[in-house]
C-alpha cells in the first residue's frame, strides 16, 4: 500500500473504465465489483445485507458500462445507503479477492476503497437506513472480537478487508 493517500486517490481517479461485459467473467468464474469500507468514529465498519442474501458485505457493487472503479464506488454508496461521498475522500486500498458470498464457485475481485466521512457525514452515519436492494445495515468491529461478529460476513470482509482495516489507523 502506498504511503501517500493522495497518490491512491489520483490513481483511482485515472483508472480506466471497466469494460461493459466484465462485471461477471463466467469463463474464469470471477465477479468484478467495487467495495467501500466506511468506519465510524469508534472504528466500527459498516456492512450491508442485500435482499435475498443472508450474509453481509461492504457497500458496493458491479460497475456500469464506462465507469471507473472510483465512479462505481461513489455511485453504489449513494444508492445503497444514501450517503454522497466526496471522491477526494476515497482511499484506494487495493484489488482484493476472496470467495464470492452469493455466487457459489465464483471468486469476487473487488477494487476496494475506504471512505473518510466528513464531520457532517459522521453525524449522518448513526441515522443511515437501507436503500435500493439493501435489506439491513450492521456495524461491526474489524478486529472480529467474537465468532458471532464474523458468522454472517462475506469472505472478502473476514479474509481481506477486516484484517487490513484492523491494522490501519482511522482516516
Locations of regions flagged by a protein language model:
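Nudix hydrolase/Nudix homology domain
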Residues: 2-7, 54-56, 130-171
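Conserved N-terminal beta-strand and adjoining loop/helix that marks the start
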Residues: 12-45, 62, 113
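Short connector loops at helix/strand junctions that flank enzyme active sites
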Residues: 31, 58, 91, 107-110, ...
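Short, charged/polar surface micro-motifs in flexible loops or helix N-caps
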Residues: 39-44, 53-54, 64, 98-99, ...
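Conserved Nudix-box catalytic region and its N-terminal flanking loop in Nudix hydrolases
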Residues: 40-80, 84
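Residues at secondary-structure transition points
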Residues: 63-68, 103, 132-135
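A short coil-to-beta-strand element that immediately follows conserved catalytic motifs
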Residues: 84-95
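Active-site-adjacent beta-strand/loop module that shapes the phosphate/pyrophosphate-binding cleft
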Residues: 96-127, 138-143, 161-169
Amino acid at each position: 500500500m502506498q504511503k501517500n493517500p493522495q497518490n491512491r486517490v489520483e490513481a483511482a481517479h485515472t483508472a480506466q473504465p471497466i469494460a461493459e461485459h466484465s462485471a461477471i467473467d463466467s469463463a474464469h468464474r470471477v465477479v468484478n465489483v467495487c467495495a467501500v469500507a466506511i468506519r465510524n468514529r469508534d472504528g466500527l465498519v459498516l456492512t450491508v445485507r442485500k435482499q435475498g442474501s443472508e450474509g453481509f458485505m461492504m457497500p458496493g457493487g458491479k460497475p456500469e458500462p464506462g465507469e471507473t472503479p472510483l465512479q462505481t464506488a461513489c455511485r453504489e454508496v449513494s444508492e445503497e445507503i444514501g450517503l454522497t461521498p466526496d471522491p477526494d475522500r476515497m482511499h484506494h486500498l487495493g484489488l482484493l479477492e476472496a470467495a464470492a458470498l452469493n455466487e457459489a464457485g465464483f471468486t469476487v475481485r473487488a477494487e476496494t476503497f475506504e471512505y473518510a466521512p466528513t464531520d457532517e457525514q459522521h453525524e449522518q452515519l448513526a441515522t443511515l437506513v437501507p436503500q435500493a436492494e439493501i435489506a439491513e445495515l450492521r456495524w461491526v468491529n474489524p478486529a472480529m472480537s467474537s465468532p458471532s461478529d464474523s458468522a454472517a460476513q462475506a469472505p472478502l470482509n473476514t479474509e481481506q478487508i477486516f484484517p487490513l482495516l484492523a491494522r490501519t489507523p482511522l482516516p
